Amino acid sequence: ESLRKIGHSDKAIVLLFTPDFRDQSTKWGQIIDLYPEAEFVFYKDVDKVSSLLGIYIPVLRPYCLMRYFKENPTMKNNAVFYCDSDVIFTDGFNIDAYIDDDVNYLSDTNSYISATYFDNKFNDVLPEKVEAYKQRDILDELTKKIGISREIAEVNNLHSGGAQYLLKNIDEAFWKRVFEGCIIIRTELQVVNREFFKNENSGFQSWCADMWSVLWNIWLQNGETKVIPEMEFSWSSDPISKLEKTGILHNAGITDKRMGGSYPAFYKGAYHMGLDPFTDPHLQEVINNETTKKYCNHYYATQLVEIKNKYNLTY
């Protein structure tokens, strides 16, 4: 809907994954009817990828992209804006100036993706594990498994972006490597976290495995990356004032139905099992709470309600 508002919904390609143990949802029909200008492609799992979802759910992204790029090899010649489905674009979104070169432009995620992030995790190692950890170089180990080096990550330290990407010269083989790489990174980091840190949350953010795999595979094929302000984004947990300065709102950063443990928030994780958010009284609590109104999360929730009412959607 937000792409339609800024005149780009005719370029939208939506890839939808159906696990091998589930039938394709009929609920998508009403969305497809609403946006005939967009392309919707359904992929039923025929490669037992569903068995990997217990390890890492985001693996379905490179899997679907691998299949789509195989079916559409000329996509390699296009600049492709790649993002999650929980994104809202604002009137300030404009990356037209960055489409016609070979540079891959990224949102700024340096703080939790870069080489510096890896090195700083030393500070969170359990005291009794410090000496053993000193014998390891986790960044070096992981980058070698993908096919690059620590040095490449260090050279590109300030352009270690992710979350939203404007990709160039990308093909099926690229997504196959990303698919394989994100499982390697996820499992390796989980092992490291169990060995050297108090818990998973204190260790490396292994849920970012696909972001590292995309980034490092760009460098593997000698691609250039640049973090640019035009792709800066607001988190759902950010103050609403930040939305005025960014072109993208990513509904991430909320981990519970209570933001900061106190005021109500729209938490997408509460609805993964099929609960209808529009029949959940909590949604109105979010909409009407004066504190929640100070955050981007409130804007995201109001946009959901607006679209539902505008098109009389059923969940």
Show where each model-derived region lies.
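Phosphate/oxyanion-binding active-site loops and adjacent basic polyanion-contact surfaces
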Residues: 1, 53-62, 174, 206-210
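GT-A fold catalytic core of metal-dependent nucleotide-sugar glycosyltransferases
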Residues: 59-120
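C-terminal catalytic/acceptor-binding lobe
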Residues: 201, 205-206, 225-226, 230-315
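Catalytic core and acceptor-binding pocket of nucleotide-sugar-dependent glycosyltransferases
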Residues: 136-252
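Surface cap/lid and interfacial helix-loop subdomains adjacent to catalytic sites
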Residues: 68, 106-153, 158-162
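N-terminal anchoring/stem segment of glycosyltransferases
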Residues: 1-57, 68-77
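Short amphipathic alpha-helical segments embedded in low-complexity Lys/Glu-rich regions
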Residues: 16-21, 82-84, 231-236
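Short catalytic/ligand-binding loop motif for oxyanion handling, primarily in non-cytosolic enzymes
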Residues: 23-24, 50-51, 88-92, 97, ...
